[in-house]
Amino acid sequence: MTVLVSLSGISKNFSGVQALKGVDFDLRAGEVHALVGENGAGKSTLMRVLAGEMKPTSGTVSIHGETMQHSGPRGAAGRGISVIHQELALAPDLTVAENIFLGRLPRIVNHRRLRKAASEILERLGFDIDPAIHAGRLTVAHQQVVEIAKALSNRARIIVFDEPTAVLANTDAERLLAIIRELRAGGTGAVYISHRLNEVFDLSDRITVMKDGSHVETLETSATDVDAVIARMVGRQMSALFPSKAGRVPGEVVVRVRNVSRGRKVRDVSFSVRAGEVVGLGGLVGSGRTEVARLVFGADKMDSGTVELNGKPLHLSSPREAVRARIGLVPEDRKQQGVILDAPIRINTTLAKIRSISRLGFLDAGKERQVAVALGAEMRLKASSVDAPVSSLSGGNQQKVALAKWFHADCDLLILDEPTRGVDVGAKGEIYNLINDLAKAGKAILVISSEHQELFGICDRVLVMAEGAIVGELTESKFTEQQLLTLAMTRSARERDETSQ
């Protein structure tokens, strides 16, 4: 197989700090090579060297067997290298077509030809996106597609995907992964950076693990497993990330959901969660788990059924009422719904219970800071100060801020929807400890996760959903991925058969 890229002995120093230490890496034509490691491992820095965004302190970059001199991003693009960053770089006020060909537009633009060329590339990717609309009006998923179209228009044969699914819903993420598979089949070489190890194993041919700026090992994906990769990333296996459940004693029922329905999304769902208990909601994408969470939180209105909190019926018409009832929700899309990115940490952490830091209707800034500092210490938050905007934090620390908000609110029931999505492995372990501490303190916790090991590692029970209904319950003695998938997939297949008859 042809080697497209060879990085040899790449080192990079920043003011005496060695970010990369003699790293070797290569990429072949028609493969997806995953690059994994904790935040700060050096993954993005290495790819910025490849993309010409940084000049290495030492080492060589070879493209198609030819050693290249550093010539900046434009030079790298000219050699067929493109990077799809997590933070997208489209010009929102330009059209889709203009974005795709940006930097290569003639002085006099024939917009009809431009739109036609853009449409042809988008159709190759399987998306019907109007090339004439402004990029700022697109969903995040469609913006990702336009970024890929831009790379293809530049005849890129080497594409780096840096956390491409971090802000995407599951269905959009699946479509993006399908595009990457098609690119691979056409001979493109792709570097895939992600904390989502399930995606890494589903997509990649090889996996390179980095730690503290060094190359640890490159593995054939088919010859390794998640535990082996995690052990190389953090020095311990996945199972070691989960805290002991000893000391968690389930008490009285905190929340009881009875026969709740909403259209075909949620159908006759009933369950309960006790104080000091962590209950999981598992199932396939689209099974109705998030919809159940939104109904319990008052974000959506149920067609029928009841929710009781501490033995009393709840009649929630909004999330505001849920917060007053001491119910909290950390949503799956933390950047859009869980935190205010541009606001400082101190505002985000106290937002759900702002009355507790107010006096006579006025905010007590000193108390706000005091609470935020205390929460930051409890959460082991890594930030320069509580005045720093949440947008400046890593994914794991952003998630800690989202959790801190509900720690401060002192909820009786906390719903966590994909609590470690887009979070590195080390931060996952810290979040699992926080969840465990809440349970030990007597809080009722409902966890939704697409990572089965996560559900089994932190939950006392797992309810399995399919086609909007709860189809089974797994206790610890039956915690296996096979059991969960058998319940989820058998019911899903049966429902589809019944619908088609």
Curated annotation (Swiss-Prot):
Domain of life assignment: Bacteria
EC number: 7.5.2.11, 7.5.2.7
GO MF annotation list: ABC-type D-ribose transporter activity; ATP binding; ATP hydrolysis activity
Compartments, as annotated in UniProt: Cell inner membrane
Protein name: Putative ribose/galactose/methyl galactoside import ATP-binding protein 1
Organism expressing this protein natively: Rhizobium meliloti (strain 1021)
Binding site for ATP: 37-44
Taxonomic classification: Bacteria, Pseudomonadati, Pseudomonadota, Alphaproteobacteria, Hyphomicrobiales
Key words of the record: ATP-binding, Cell inner membrane, Cell membrane, Membrane, Nucleotide-binding, Repeat, Sugar transport, Translocase, Transport
Job description of the protein: Part of an ABC transporter complex involved in carbohydrate import. Could be involved in ribose, galactose and/or methyl galactoside import. Responsible for energy coupling to the transport system.
Entry's transmembrane regions: none
Principal place of residence: membrane
Domain ABC transporter: 5-237, 249-492
Pfam families given in the database record: ABC_tran (PF00005)
Single GO cellular component term: plasma membrane
Family: Belongs to the ABC transporter superfamily. Carbohydrate importer 2 (CUT2) (TC 3.A.1.2) family.
SMART domains with a match to the protein in the record: AAA
Catalytic activity: D-ribose(out) + ATP + H2O = D-ribose(in) + ADP + phosphate + H(+); D-galactose(out) + ATP + H2O = D-galactose(in) + ADP + phosphate + H(+)
Record PANTHER family: CARBOHYDRATE TRANSPORT ATP-BINDING PROTEIN MG119-RELATED, D-ALLOSE IMPORT ATP-BINDING PROTEIN ALSA-RELATED
